[in-house]
Amino acid sequence: MAVLLLHQFKALPADKQIDTCSFLDSVSHLPAFFDCLGSAIFSPIKADITGNITKIRSVYESNPTQFKTLQMILEGEKELYGPKWPKAGATLALMWLKRGLKFIQVLLQSISDGERDDQNPNLIKVNITKAYDIALKNYHGWLVQKFFQTALIAAPYKDDFLKALSKGQAVKEEECIEKIRKFLVNYTTTIEAIYIMYNKMNAELDYKA
């Protein structure tokens, strides 16, 4: 579970402001999560997440004080870009990034909740499908959706996935699930706060990639 627990997300303060530097430090290690799915077919999602992290980091590093929190980035870019906002800058990058992060969150939550295909209990195809349907499907065109259906054929066995999360170490499933639940606490709170922020600022867009 080293892929997740070595870089846990920090608890949010009462006002739910998300420190940009801390967020970027934690999220920058998540692209490796897709290597645990065992197929290069998932690489487009990994590449998308990596690219959006780079865009957000570039904006943050241009003025760390002005963009101390993710909320400050959206507010600053709203003023900067005017009518082009929110389809611009780090605001657009974070919009897509949060969807990729949501995919990870739903997938891990589904596994930790014990959801499975009774006919193939050691496959995580049902968990990946749920995560994709909730987090990404509505924002993908027909071609991308078909590509994802192909990717499902390469979905790993749960045992192999959990072992990959633990960087090849043999660990009991119960221990892995408990560590996933621990990781999800602050991670889920952070993702939810970003979604709420986008809704409050009317920054959410529903166009398809």
UniProtKB/Swiss-Prot annotation:
| Organism domain of life | Eukaryota
**Transport as a keyword?**
yes
sequence repeat ranges are 45-55, 56-66
Q: Name one GO biological process term.
A: ceramide transport
Care to name a GO molecular-function term for this sequence? Answer: ceramide 1-phosphate transfer activity
Keyword Repeat tagged: yes
Recorded hits in SUPFAM superfamilies, A to Z, give: Glycolipid transfer protein, GLTP
What GO cellular component entries does it have? cytosol; membrane
* The entry's keywords: Cytoplasm, Lipid transport, Repeat, Transport
Q: Where in the cell is it found?
A: Cytoplasm
Summarize where beta-D-galactosyl-(1->4)-beta-D-glucosyl-(1<->1)-N-[(9Z)-octadecenoyl]-sphing-4-enine binds, as residue positions.
D48, I49, T50, G51, N52, I53, T54, K55, H140, Y207
Residue segments, region 2 X 12 AA approximate tandem repeats = 45-66
Note the InterPro entries from the entry: GLTP_sf, Glycolipid_transfer_prot_dom
Q: Which family does it belong to?
A: Belongs to the GLTP family.
What the protein does comes down to: Accelerates the intermembrane transfer of various glycolipids. Catalyzes the transfer of various glycosphingolipids between membranes but does not catalyze the transfer of phospholipids. May be involved in the intracellular translocation of glucosylceramides.
Q: What is this protein called?
A: Glycolipid transfer protein B
Q: Which gene encodes it?
A: gltp-b
